[in-house]
Amino acid sequence: MKKFLTTICAVFVLAVIMGSGATTTEAKTAAYTSTITKDYRTTWSNGSKKVYLNKTRNKLYCKNLKSGKAQLLQKLKVDSESDQSYNISYVYGNNIYLSSMYGAGDGDTYVYNMKTKTYKRLKKYFIIQDAYDKYLITSEYMPTDISPYPTYVYEITSKGVKKVAKLGNNTSSAVFVNGKIYYASYPKPENADESELYRVNIYTCKKDGSAKKKIYTKKAGKKDGYIIVHAITDDIIDYTMTTKDGQLVQYEYNRTTGKTQKVTQE
């Protein structure tokens, strides 16, 4: 069971950082949309250009899809001792936002402007988890275990970014779905017997973080157990929880039907 839990944690953290699965980036009103490569690099395209990192993630390129020619935009400094790695979090207007992850879940965001050809650090301890239009779901760090963490909503402005909302202190799995935000929030334990992840509430709100509404709540089978939320959509909440007999089981809750079913592991 410990090995199973460790695997879940690793996959979940990778999904959030790289923008796959639970955190598919939406950019419906922006010119660029994203895809994930087999080696978990996020590439962005507007139909005529493609913005991407090379396989070693130390060079930023823009490729003209008509001519097939690629232009080197920026070389990226990589500190191998801190396991530093880059990923393109978002492309909005002329700005390319890059997340620089290092250490035990720390991260900074850098921005390259394709018009002015300038590159700078936008904000330290600032990780873009997901994006929609001019709004960003962010965190100050990304735990490498299953611990919840503070999540914020920022707005892209002409001067950089501006914080417009805080979703909560003990949150996870925040994502944009059809222009709305969905996220998991873990309330404080009611007594010493309950674990930090014993009870979870699922919320939705507007894209700017306002008008929060609780849509689902769930408790683990044991007070010292866990509930780990993997993905949230308009209809489905996918999670793994500790059952009464101490097993870790994955479930899907369908909000439309109100039914919960066990997910079979292949």
Report each predicted region and the residues it spans.
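Positively charged n-region of N-terminal signal peptides that target proteins for export
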Residues: 1-6
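Residue position within the beta-strands of beta-propeller blades
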Residues: 52-53, 96-99, 136-139, 181-185, ...
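Surface-exposed loop/turn elements that mediate protein-protein interactions on large endomembrane-trafficking
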Residues: 27-35, 56-77, 103-123, 145-167, ...
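Short, conserved, GDST-rich strand-edge loop motifs in beta-rich repeat architectures
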Residues: 141-148, 185-197
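Repeated scaffold domains used in trafficking and secretory/extracellular systems
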Residues: 35-45, 80-91, 123-134, 168-178, ...
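Bacterial N-terminal signal peptides
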Residues: 9-19
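Sec-dependent signal peptide cleavage junction
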Residues: 17-31
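Generic beta-strand structural signal
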Residues: 45, 53-55, 90-91, 112-114, ...
